[in-house]
Amino acid sequence: MSLAGKEFKLSNGNKIPAVAFGTGTKYFKRGHNDLDKQLIGTLELALRSGFRHIDGAEIYGTNKEIGIALKNVGLNRKDVFITDKYNSGNHTYDGKHSKHQNPYNALKADLEDLGLEYVDLYLIHFPYISEKSHGFDLVEAWRYLERAKNEGLARNIGVSNFTIENLKSILDANTDSIPVVNQIEFSAYLQDQTPGIVEYSQQQGILIEAYGPLGPITQGRPGPLDKVLSKLSEKYKRNEGQILLRWVLQRGILPITTTSKEERINDVLEIFDFELDKEDEDQITKVGKEKTLRQFSKEYSKYD
């Protein structure tokens, strides 16, 4: 894939806006169903400010808010990129996954909540799927995504939080397509969620999407990058969040971030207005490796 302007080109030739607004983390409902009016307003502001990529998921419980915001703003459907994810459950295989029979059925239900006929990208949220816990294995789960794509319910399909082994299980199977995206936690303090996953994904033409890209300044202080980011912020006349997001982008990775503040929304969109020198990009990469910060998916901490 390649970055051209404000878009990445996926391995299947389709394009994806190069930064996404996330509706998880602080907006994650954790089981309650009350409509989040603040999120609706924030999404409307983000869309009106120029965001064209909204990242959602079944487990976040925010699809109705996304749908309402889209309707209120009134953009042409083709001009907005919507991501959804199948709730596959956690690493304990405890049965607490999607209430729907399979990923295909889950997407159809999510589309009703979104008020849409299709999503632009549909992902398996976690690889924790087995015949015992779900009634189908990981490869069969992928075939449900292929069915959704073939029927026009999802324009692109991919995965999230997959290891090399997980990816190989799909790539080595006799499937009709391969994932175009692997969405993982990625930041300067976590440059591989699991061993070798970024390089391997990119070698296979799979775009890495990064959640948690601002960890070094939101949860990683004090840290070895503090002085580096301060100097680069002064050099480029950009704030430290913009420096980190631009670094992610220049690594060929799509950053996902979120905020409720108007100035921060505009800050994110300005990462396309400057470029880090190669030596500065490399310095962030090198110094970032001096610390490990894992904000999510703590089951992967065995690799730290």
UniProtKB/Swiss-Prot annotation:
Catalytic residues (UniProt): 60, 125
Record bears the keyword NADP: yes
Keywords of the record: NADP, Oxidoreductase
SUPFAM superfamilies: NAD(P)-linked oxidoreductase
Free-text function comment from the UniProt entry: NADPH-dependent conjugated polyketone reductase with broad substrate specificity and strict stereospecificity. Reduces ketopantoyl lactone (2-dehydropantolactone) and isatin. Does not act on menadione, p-nitrobenzaldehyde and pyridine-3-aldehyde.
Chain positions recorded as NADPH binding sites: 23-26, 55, 160, 183, 214, 259-261, 264
Any one GO biological process: ketone metabolic process
Protein name: NADPH-dependent conjugated polyketone reductase C1
